[in-house]
Regions:
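ATPase catalytic-site recognition across NTP-hydrolyzing enzymes
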Residues: 1-53
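A residue-level signal for conserved active-site and pocket-lining positions in enzyme catalytic cores
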Residues: 13, 54, 62, 105, ...
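Short, glycine/acidic-enriched loop or turn micro-motifs at the edges of active sites
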Residues: 57
Length: 253
């Protein structure tokens, strides 16, 4: 009977969409709850802003994250849209961002893959449309570890290091709450149902990246670098970036 077989029969023969989502292994982010992770007020003071994306022809998923001088991060905008070309995706992101200054645009390594027919990559197309992407790690375990650390609720503050501005990221929160552990590799989240992975993969780009807090001084004198140096900087390691800043000054990105 279904009662005797429990999770096994639920996974093989789900009666509802909700049952289909609740595969064996359990929720990967059980800590994510609206009462702890969603906040009513935006971060204030000097802020660094990032956009992290997951892109494919089936879906563009993007999230805007701001970080203050105390290493508090807040996701304050999301955007999901299927069937966009790379050029359309870049133009849409720039339009939504408007005049906000974005420190870094974060993306997974597959966007640097060149197509056999054109020899161009998504990175190339975004660059032509005015967005210079920065490559993050695609290591799933490292990314999941980073996400768990950012989303862990502090015993002291009763809040995670990464929060969500109220009513701005409903789909991301839904996906984080629904996505399950990989039943064969419980230390990472499952890649099915695929519909749940876009927003989670996007946020993983931010969480796996080395993130600098906002400068405590509001007025930081920045230097204008050559385009080739800026591209090298965006793709450099933490250590190389520090050396470049030491030699050339803070870049005007």
């Amino acid at each position: 009977t279904k009662r005797a077989l429990g999770d096994l029969i639920t996974a093989e023969y789900p009666a509802t969409i909700e049952e289909a989502l609740m595969v064996p292994g359990g929720a990967y982010f059980p800590e994510v709850k609206k009462d702890t992770h969603e906040v009513a007020e935006p971060l204030t003071g000097p802020l660094r802003r990032y956009v992290c994306i997951d892109y494919g022809l089936d879906m563009l998923s993007a999230h805007w994250v701001q970080v203050d001088t105390s290493e508090n991060a807040q996701c304050y905008r999301e955007y999901d849209m299927p069937d966009l070309t790379a050029g359309q995706a870049a133009d849409t992101l720039l339009s939504i961002t408007s005049d906000e200054y974005i420190d870094t645009w974060l993306a997974p390594p597959d966007l640097w893959n060149r197509r056999n027919d054109t020899g161009r990559s998504v990175f190339d197309i975004f660059y032509e449309h005015g967005i210079i992407l920065t490559k993050t790690s695609n290591d799933l375990f490292s990314g999941c570890t980073g996400m768990k650390e950012w989303l862990r609720v502090s015993e002291e503050t009763k809040r995670p290091a990464l929060t969500f501005l109220k009513d701005t990221c409903p789909n991301l929160i839904r996906c984080l709450q629904k996505i399950q552990k990989d039943k064969n590799k419980p230390k990472v989240y499952a890649k099915t149902p695929h519909e749940l992975t876009h927003d989670v993969d996007s946020l993983r780009c931010f969480c796996v990246w080395w993130v600098r807090s906002a400068d405590k001084k509001k007025n930081v004198k920045k230097k204008k670098w050559r385009a080739d140096l800026i591209e090298d900087y965006r793709n450099a390691s933490k250590e190389i970036r520090a050396l470049m800043i030491k030699e050339l000054g803070e870049p005007m990105l």
